[in-house]
Amino acid sequence: MYGIPDRLKPLSAAEEQVLLALWDCKPPASRRDIGARLAAKGWAAATVLNFLYRLEEKGWVICTKEQNRNLYSPTVTRRAYGVFTMRQRLDTVFGGDLAQAVRALVSESGCSQS
């Protein structure tokens, strides 16, 4: 659906943050690299590792071994995920009506339509 395989399970907000950090790392990335991107959250290394494990179980991430460390890669692109999440919100909130969503965004944001 929208560039995202149907087999993928929904993400929690925290899992999404870890996936975003992974994309920012220019994958494949180690747990340490991903954790560094999430330092402001104050999560322990074990917490980041737990979220990576969940993402792997849900099919969003694959883990490969290189020497004695695990490297993580997303199974979908950031763009595909963005389209998928926007489409979900568009369908849920605006019944799939893009024009209605854009009108609401323009009127609520104070942007001009010109």
Which stretches of residues belong to each language-model region?
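Short helix-capping/hinge SLiMs at alpha-helix to coil transitions
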Residues: K9, L22-P28, K41
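Pre-recognition alpha-helix immediately N-terminal to the DNA-recognition helix
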Residues: E16-A21, D33
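Short, cationic-aromatic polyanion-contact patches
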Residues: P10-A14, E66-T85
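Short acidic, hydrophobic short linear motifs in intrinsically disordered regions
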Residues: P28-R37
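Amphipathic alpha-helical dimerization/coiled-coil segments
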Residues: F84-S114
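Short, Lys/Arg-enriched N-terminal segment that forms or immediately precedes the first helix
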Residues: M1-L8, F84-R87
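A short, conserved structural fragment
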Residues: E56-E66
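Short helix-coil junctions and helix-kink-helix linkers
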Residues: A36-A45
